[in-house]
Amino acid sequence: MAKVLVLYYSSYGHVETMAQHIVEGAKSVPGVEVTLKRVPETIPVDQARAIGVKVDQAAPVATVDELADYDAIIFGTPTRFGNMAGQMRTFLDQTGGLWMKGALVGKIGSVFASTGTQHGGQETTITSFHTTLLHHGMVIVGVPYACSGLVNMNEITGGTPYGATTLAGADGSRQPSANELDIARYQGKHVAELANKLAS
């Protein structure tokens, strides 16, 4: 049985929502065990609450060492100036021990993201995230154009061949659209299917 981890950081709930739909897609694949976890918050709780960060999230906090237990990891992060959020970077910067052991070599790595604006760095966030995964020897998986939501020209929408994305709006008021959530589910299903093949 393939084991898939959906691991995310979410400030205001947009990436959390995307993660939940990625889990839904992954769970639609028979013979796959799917786990949803988040990385630790690095902002002190009182300060985080004061700026509107969604501190209370149902997903348990992951540990670095457990990453080696999964056949595929789908990472989710909001964008910070075209890069992953500092909380995710801090977590990944602790994976040196896993790198030394080659613990993630051959495992699937996939990424999804959220930005405040339509051209706010979704693709650079995901592709720069890939650099870390490649250093770990992971096999990168995105979202193929077999996913029809990628070519939706009828609305402003996230979604790239590099991974599912959503647009939060500058004030965070926009929630993931139906199309964006469909792409997220597709990514989860696609990764889970490939993880099953690699694990067999």
UniProtKB/Swiss-Prot annotation:
Any one cellular component term from GO for this entry?
A: membrane
Annotated binding of NAD(+), by residue: Y12
* Co-factor requirement: FMN
Q: Where is the Flavodoxin-like domain?
A: 4-191
Keyword Metal-binding part of the UniProt annotation: no
**Reaction(s) the record says it catalyses:** a quinone + NADH + H(+) = a quinol + NAD(+); a quinone + NADPH + H(+) = a quinol + NADP(+)
The top EC class is: oxidoreductase
EC number from the UniProt entry: 1.6.5.2
- UniProt xrefs under Pfam families: FMN_red (PF03358)
Q: How is the cofactor bound?
A: Binds 1 FMN per monomer.
PROSITE patterns the record matches: FLAVODOXIN_LIKE
> Which keywords does UniProt give here?
Flavoprotein, FMN, NAD, NADP, Nucleotide-binding, Oxidoreductase
Where, in this chain's numbering, is substrate bound?
A: W99
One molecular function GO term is: NADH:ubiquinone reductase (non-electrogenic) activity
* Chain positions recorded as FMN binding sites: 10-15, 79-81, 114-120, 135
Gene3D superfamilies the record matches: 3.40.50.360
Give the family per the record.
Answer: Belongs to the WrbA family.
Q: What is this protein called?
A: NAD(P)H dehydrogenase (quinone)
- Origin species, per record, is Burkholderia cenocepacia (strain ATCC BAA-245 / DSM 16553 / LMG 16656 / NCTC 13227 / J2315 / CF5610) (Burkholderia cepacia (strain J2315))
